[in-house]
Regions:
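C-terminal motif of bacterial Sec signal peptides marking the signal peptidase cleavage site
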Residues: 11-14
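Sec-dependent signal peptide recognition
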Residues: 1-9
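Exposed beta-sheet edge and beta->alpha loop/turn motif
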Residues: 80-131
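Short solvent-exposed beta->alpha transition segments
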Residues: 40-92
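Post-signal peptide N-terminal segment of mature Sec-exported envelope proteins
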Residues: 23-45, 69-70
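Second-shell loop/turn segments in exported
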Residues: 28-29, 47-51, 97
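Bacterial signal peptide processing site
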Residues: 16-19
Length: 131
């Protein structure tokens, strides 16, 4: 009987859909806010996991420094890869990898979103130069 309950729980965990489209919309929002310098709004809309890992002022400074020294202005982006990660324990995640063109360079951007109460929240972000 225990195995039946375990199987039932695993099946229920697998039924919860992860909305990749919502995560992609959040990437568009990220780029719009980046372009407008709305770094505090980005931070406030991020997951508690991200907010607990970096202060608001450090987050803002990282993005300002990225714009000034590495990236410049955002121009366009293309989705290269997407992955849904369903956890038995913890929040489900969507990982999106983009090739993005900025005025100073082309980068690979990796966005990690976690599903919190039905909404996709930014959990992690990084970029690496590809030119």
């Amino acid at each position: 009987m225990r195995y039946f309950y375990l199987l039932f729980i695993l099946v229920l965990c697998g039924c919860s859909p992860l909305d990749v489209n919502s995560a992609q919309e959040e990437v568009s929002r990220f780029h719009d806010f980046y372009q407008s310098g709305k770094y505090i709004e980005l931070y406030n809309g991020a997951s508690k996991t991200l907010q607990e890992s970096i202060s608001e002022s450090d987050f803002v400074n990282v993005l300002k420094r990225a714009e000034v020294t590495d990236l410049g202005k955002f121009q366009k982006t293309t989705l290269k890869s997407q992955k849904k990660v369903k956890h038995l324990i913890g929040s489900d995640e969507v990982v999106l990898i983009y090739a993005s063109v900025y005025s100073k360079r082309i980068v690979q951007e990796i966005f990690v979103f976690e599903k919190i109460k039905g909404n996709m929240k930014l959990k992690g972000y990084k970029y690496d130069s590809i030119n």
